[in-house]
């Protein structure tokens, strides 16, 4: 996917990129490659693939959800900034918080935000399990995003405690999501969530399937969740 296709295919989905946004994506790619030489941020390095598999894919929730309103977003395990930084570039009014357990990734993201001129962005070096127990963050976000971080049963425990009641947890998955979802239904329910939509689409050009799961927070998460670091993965809610 070249930059012209990126621009055109987003236009077809109702997302118009300003010249500033296009320049920010260009700089994002440059910084990603520069920093990737000193730390492992992405295995995908050729420009067309980064634009398709990272930038375009990260914006896919906006094909189904209205990000034009004033929203607070928390991205759990953002890695090199996906999906939240592309969303912030396209929708600069979003109030963004990023949580990642690796300090060097946070350092990259802080540098990236400064270079791109992003405002109203906060970065937290923390485990999702401990972050979700802090009163100032627990059940405080309109949207929580996660992209292929863990299985749904695990991911729900890391993310749903951060979503405010009536807010939305957006889980971005590859094609194998159905089985994962079946195994994760109990956890979603226990943690106060309810599946509101499952959207499947083909990533253009390479025609690989993607699934986006939208989970609405319908009631408060019980105080015992999230459990201590490592427990959601070792003993998922079943």
Curated annotation (Swiss-Prot):
Cell compartment(s), UniProt: Cytoplasm
GO molecular function terms noted in the UniProt entry: rRNA (guanine-N7-)-methyltransferase activity
Keyword tags: Cytoplasm, Methyltransferase, rRNA processing, S-adenosyl-L-methionine, Transferase
Residues binding S-adenosyl-L-methionine: 77, 82, 128-129, 147
UniProt keyword Membrane, yes or no: no
Main localization (coarse): cytoplasm
Domain of life from the UniProt record: Bacteria
Record-listed E.C. numbers: 2.1.1.-
Annotated Gene Ontology cellular component terms: cytosol
Similarity remark: Belongs to the methyltransferase superfamily. RNA methyltransferase RsmG family.
Function: Specifically methylates the N7 position of guanine in position 535 of 16S rRNA.
HAMAP family: 16SrRNA_methyltr_G
Entry protein name: Ribosomal RNA small subunit methyltransferase G
Species assigned in the record: Geobacillus sp. (strain WCH70)
Gene of this entry: rsmG
